[in-house]
Amino acid sequence: APRGPVCDCHNLDILSKIIEQAKLLAEKHKAYMLKIDPMISYDDIESINNLKRLGFKYNADIPEDNTIQCQRNYILDIKNKTEDEIFSSFHSKWRYNIRLAVRKGVSCKYYGVEKLDDFCELMQATGKRDGFAIRSKEYFEKFLSAFEENARLYMCYSPDGEAISGALTVRYGNRVSYVYGASSDTQRNLMPNYLMQWNMIKWAIESQCDIYDFMGIPHCDEENHSNYGVYRFKKGFNGEIVKYAGEFDYIFSNVKHTVISFLLHSIGYTKL
């Protein structure tokens, strides 16, 4: 799961056991802090208070650029709905773009590790274009290996065989989540990203999931922000915004935390 720990945060006993095991790992690896980002709502006061009671520091309302993940996700409720019902709910322009990609001959399928080189090239281009660090090929190999049939690498190719879009998605519990995405700087007029999302949504439907999770929507309330386009794209699939509680820190060593925080801030690194 993209967020964790994966447990019932209403259960204080379970949370206590997680902390005790985390302390053992922290001692073994000389860790100074545990950061968690559980899948609990921002208004789940009971869970938030349980974590605070156990000693977690709640990082409420910190700037969005300073968090590891977005606090808000965009999700699509697909429970007990057919493909036709879901497709017809999309914005008309989004339906048009999906059909356009098909008409233009875009191929969208899921693959194994044999297409990771193509995906990593797209990630390089996307990271350079949008200004974010990217994972290594080895990381993505481990991702696919760890989740086995519950992870899929989707790739879109143009009619001339060029890789133009790719995504890694994972199925767990009652949902499918779009975890990593990348696209080419060329042939964007073929609208591959729309078709790729539709194929991943169809996998969620086939898997009888309740939710398709588009994941983060950074700065979704700031229309003039450079990241607002992420929300605009996902919004066309007619889902809804969910807001999570955010990050909590458990400090194992106050001295180490103070020193390391100071050093990281001094070099301009803010995601602590």
Region locations from a protein language model:
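A conserved beta-strand-loop-helix scaffold within acyl/acetyltransferase catalytic domains
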Residues: L24, P38-N189
